[in-house]
């Protein structure tokens, strides 16, 4: 079926006996929903398109999608045999998997642009390609390849997934993998930044390049290794190790243990609640004036008689 030179289309592929197996969209904003009994090919062309692959029975999967150029949304409910190309633009791919074919897997390519992958699926392959892409995963044996750009893996989705909730995750960007508390392993290729979970105890290790590593909640251990890294413990009692390079360490709330390592490091505090008094205070173990280390309090309240936080002003600029 070819539909072209129209301002936009909205199409639902029915469950009837006769239906189109190849769909061509327009260069405008199209909405295409699959409800038919057979696999289809979709060529959406340009425009900000919404595409839904929502068969959830034995007829699902094995589709081909070329979303084209534009900021597209592709939602897939059946995992197995799908080849999906998001194309140019800042796209969103959602694997809201309700049914899967255990004998097959999906392959999804992000194309150019800053894409977002929300993955609640199993053992499929995801390629960010060019751009600064973000992968959200529950940790079910997937393969993630960021490609070029500065790319991020996040396991925040575990917080809402009962099978892994509260078990934490181990992420090692230098060795290109992550494992969940249940022992499931995912491959992480060409990914620079990582975010853990809100409820588990996460162990996050960076690589030789600059990384941004976030622990969120729980007792997290974060190690930057090489590069100029940003380490953010979030809430909970965290241990942060900068390694080599000029690193920024933010313990967040809780009793935190901060080790800058070699290089000019900054220990960044943004609220008085981030370090308690007495035995619950944060500990910096290796502050060295010779390395020009800094304790940054510039965003903490300088005048308690005024509401809100007022930054410090230093004599001489």
Feature-to-residue mapping (PLM):
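Acidic glycine/aspartate-rich repeat arrays in secreted/surface proteins
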Residues: 162-167, 264-317
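Residues in short coils/turns that link rungs of repeat/solenoid architectures in beta-rich domains
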Residues: 81, 100, 160, 195-201
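Parallel beta-helix/beta-solenoid
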Residues: 37, 60, 69, 79, ...
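Surface-exposed loop/turn motifs in large extracellular/passenger domains
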Residues: 38, 58-64, 80, 100-107, ...
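Acidic/polar low-complexity surface segments
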Residues: 98-100, 158-182, 269-274
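Short beta-strand elements of solenoid repeat domains
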Residues: 22-24, 33, 41-45, 50-52, ...
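Short, Lys/Arg-enriched N-terminal segments with co-localized hydrophobic residues
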Residues: 3-18
């Amino acid at each position: 079926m070819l539909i072209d030179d129209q301002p936009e289309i909205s199409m639902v592929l029915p469950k009837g006996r006769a239906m189109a197996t190849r769909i061509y969209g327009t260069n405008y904003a199209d909405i295409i929903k699959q409800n038919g009994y057979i696999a289809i090919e979709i060529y959406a062309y340009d425009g900000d398109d919404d595409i839904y692959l929502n068969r959830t029975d034995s007829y699902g999967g094995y589709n081909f999608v070329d979303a084209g150029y534009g900021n597209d949304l592709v939602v897939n409910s059946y995992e197995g045999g799908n080849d999906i190309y998001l194309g140019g633009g800042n796209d969103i791919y959602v694997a809201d998997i309700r049914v899967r074919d255990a004998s097959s897997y999906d392959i999804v390519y992000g194309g150019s642009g800053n894409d977002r992958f929300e993955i609640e699926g199993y053992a499929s392959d995801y390629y960010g390609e060019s751009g600064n892409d973000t992968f959200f995963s529950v940790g079910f044996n997937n393969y993630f390849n960021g490609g070029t750009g500065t790319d991020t893996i996040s396991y925040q989705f575990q917080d809402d997934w009962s099978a892994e909730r509260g078990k934490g995750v181990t992420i090692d960007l230098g060795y290109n993998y992550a494992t969940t508390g249940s022992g499931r392993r995912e491959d992480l290729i060409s990914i620079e930044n990582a975010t853990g979970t809100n409820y588990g105890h996460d162990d996050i290790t960076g690589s030789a390049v600059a990384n941004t590593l976030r622990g969120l909640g729980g007792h997290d251990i974060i190690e930057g290794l090489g590069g100029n890294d940003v380490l953010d413990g979030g809430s909970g009692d965290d241990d942060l190790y900068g390694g080599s390079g000029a690193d920024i360490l933010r313990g967040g709330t809780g009793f935190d243990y901060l080790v800058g390592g070699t290089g000019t490091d900054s220990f960044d505090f943004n609220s008085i609640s981030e370090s308690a008094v007495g035995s619950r205070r944060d500990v910096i173990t290796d502050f060295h004036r010779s390395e020009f280390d800094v304790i940054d309090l510039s965003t903490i309240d300088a005048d308690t008689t005024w509401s809100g936080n007022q930054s410090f002003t230093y004599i001489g600029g």
